[in-house]
From Swiss-Prot:
One of its GO terms (molecular function) is nicotinate-nucleotide-dimethylbenzimidazole phosphoribosyltransferase activity. Keywords: Cobalamin biosynthesis, Glycosyltransferase, Transferase. The keyword Transferase applies. Gene3D superfamilies: 1.10.1610.10, 3.40.50.10210. The gene is cobT. Catalyzes the synthesis of alpha-ribazole-5'-phosphate from nicotinate mononucleotide (NAMN) and 5,6-dimethylbenzimidazole (DMB). Its EC number is 2.4.2.21. The active site is at E317. The keyword Oxidoreductase does not apply. It comes from the Bacteria. This is Nicotinate-nucleotide--dimethylbenzimidazole phosphoribosyltransferase. It comes from Pseudomonas putida (strain GB-1). One of its GO terms (biological process) is cobalamin biosynthetic process.
Length: 351
């Protein structure tokens, strides 16, 4: 690839703002550290936003969708037609993420990167159509080099649109029947971990289905000879359009200075790809939750992430990240609106 924009420097954190936020935390009317992880979140957001008292009024959510050729191997409980049907549900307002976006007063963008329905035309959806889904990675690389680069760029473009619209937080979500298989395959490469330890039920496989899924992945990894040292090759061979777009969006946000809240298993795989491609972007990633897919815990550990929630979620769509937004907003409100000891005339140390 010649256009390696993903290697460009990310926006620097504002260390002065973080120092000021830390000093403010020490003066608020509470024992130091008593708000636990919320205190660190407020300080981190101060550094990301470049101000002592961060706010999260403007949240942008983008759903990236794409179908997966590996579904031909019988690794999903649902037919591929569901991907296109869910696009209609997203823009129609009936999906979980649609409801959450309304409740959060967040913008919601839906990007079709390539479903099996080439005739699909939905108002409110960006149809980019990089292909009729990826190729079956059990037999050949999932994406061509041009498709991979276009998917990364599509994610970056979404991040730049969010930045131009004043977003203070970006959430990427995904939709694609078969994408937990692609994500588990990528995770297996990047973590150097057997697929059987990372594969889960996805949309509802039984135990035999999960075993078959892991066997398909292991066979594909032997075919392609992938290594963690070449994340782009791994992404192109066993990834998905939407996973590549998520990785591009995460790097694009970090370069544009927009904080990212990462959703579940699939989004965390994309985050690990992004960090492999540009380690500087890690500072811009917050992690919403630990989901039910068995590989998610290992991914979070590799990313040194402290998720905010653990609710047994495995829906995707960015839903877990959306559920964590109120926590981030409350962390900012506590940090910005609590009185200091001096303001409240409260003693700042025990008697």
């Amino acid at each position: 690839m010649t256009q390696a924009w993903w290697r460009d420097a990310c926006h620097p954190l504002d260390n002065d703002a973080m120092d000021q936020a830390h000093a403010r935390q020490q003066q608020l009317t509470k024992p130091a550290g008593s708000l636990g992880q919320l205190e660190g979140l407020a300080i981190q957001l101060a550094g990301l936003q470049g101000c002592e008292r961060p706010i999260l009024d403007q949240v942008a959510i983008t759903i990236f969708a794409g179908d997966h050729g590996v579904v031909e191997e019988g690794i999903s409980a649902y037919p591929q037609a569901v991907t296109g049907q869910m696009l209609r549900n997203f823009v129609g307002g009936g999906a979980a993420i649609s409801v959450l976006a309304r409740q959060l007063q967040a913008s919601l963008e839906v990007v079709d990167l390539g479903t099996i329905d080439a005739q699909l035309e939905l108002p409110g959806v960006r149809h980019l159509r990089l292909g009729a889904g990826t190729a079956n990675f059990a037999c050949q690389p999932a994406m061509t080099e041009n498709q991979l680069q276009a998917a990364l760029q599509a994610g970056r473009d979404s991040a730049l649109r969010a930045a131009e619209q004043g977003a203070q937080l970006f959430i990427g979500g995904e939709m694609g029947i078969g994408n937990t298989t692609a994500a588990a395959a990528l995770a297996s490469v990047l973590l150097s971990c057997p697929a059987a330890q990372l594969s889960g039920p996805g949309t509802g496989l039984d135990n035999a289905g999960v075993r078959h899924k892991a066997e398909v992945i292991e066979r594909a990894l032997r075919l392609h000879g992938l290594r963690a040292e070449n994340p782009l090759q791994a992404l192109g061979c066993v990834g998905g359009f939407e996973i590549a777009a998520l990785a591009g969006a995460y790097i694009g946000c970090a370069q544009a200075g927009v904080a990212v809240l990462v959703d579940g298993f699939i989004c965390s795989v994309a985050a690990l790809v992004a960090v492999h491609l540009n380690p500087q972007c890690r500072a811009w990633l917050l992690f919403a939750h630990q989901g039910a897919e068995p590989g998610h815990k290992a991914l979070l550990a590799a990313l040194q992430a402290e998720p905010l929630l653990a609710l047994g979620l495995r829906l995707g769509e960015g839903s877990g990240a959306a559920l964590a937004v109120p926590l981030l907003r409350l962390a900012c409100a506590l940090h910005g609106q609590m009185a200091t000891f001096a303001e409240a005339a409260v003693a700042d140390r025990p008697a």
